A protein has these predicted regions:
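Core Rossmann-like FAD-binding/catalytic domain of the broad FAD-dependent monooxygenase superfamily
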Residues: 1-175
Length: 175
């Protein structure tokens, strides 16, 4: 299901138009709309909201790996605040770990990025099961509400997705 339009009059309910999985168009009316529709928010556009670009943009890499050998970590999330290489690291379960690193110019290998967490003579099995990149941009909407439509999560503000913080910020917005 994909929302294709959000419209509201001065008073009364909000009209939401959506397309179902078969391509059929439908409408429904709601007392309020919570626009949790991300960085490219249709709801933000519907209320006339625009981004303020805070001119901050960084590329990050996420690496999920399975390993049988020892990894230097503690039970929790490590947030590394090194200006040369900020990052986030956590144990997901007994054998799976996640690293997130800000990328610099010149692509480092996965082994170079995670070397600080592995002993020099690391002998365990190590398999990258997921590797992806994203670009974090700092942007803030000039409004979070228009009539009976409200913005939550990445629709009004972009948040780095460290360990689910993108989702968690949307829940905090709702509270």
């Amino acid at each position: 299901v994909e929302v294709t339009a959000v419209r509201q009059e001065t008073a009364g309910p909000v009209r939401v138009t959506y397309r179902d999985e078969d391509g059929g168009e439908h409408e429904l009316w709601a007392d309020a709309v919570l626009g949790c529709d991300g960085a490219n928010s249709l709801t933000r556009e519907a209320i006339g909201g625009v981004w303020e670009d805070l001119r901050f943009e960084e590329r990050w890499k996420v690496i999920d790996a399975e390993t049988t050998g020892p990894v230097r970590c503690w039970e929790g999330v490590d947030q590394v605040c090194d200006p040369a290489r900020p990052g986030t690291f956590m144990r997901v379960n007994e054998t799976r770990y996640r690293w997130e690193f800000r990328l610099r110019d010149g692509q480092e290998t996965v082994r170079e990025l995670i070397a600080p967490w592995l002993p020099p003579s690391y002998a365990g099995d190590f398999e990258v099961v997921r590797e992806t990149q994203y670009t974090f941009r700092a942007r803030l909407a000039d409004r979070w509400r228009g009539g009976r439509a409200f913005l939550l999560g990445d629709a009004p503000h972009l948040t780095p997705p460290f360990v689910g913080q993108g989702l968690c910020s949307g829940l905090r917005d709702a509270y």
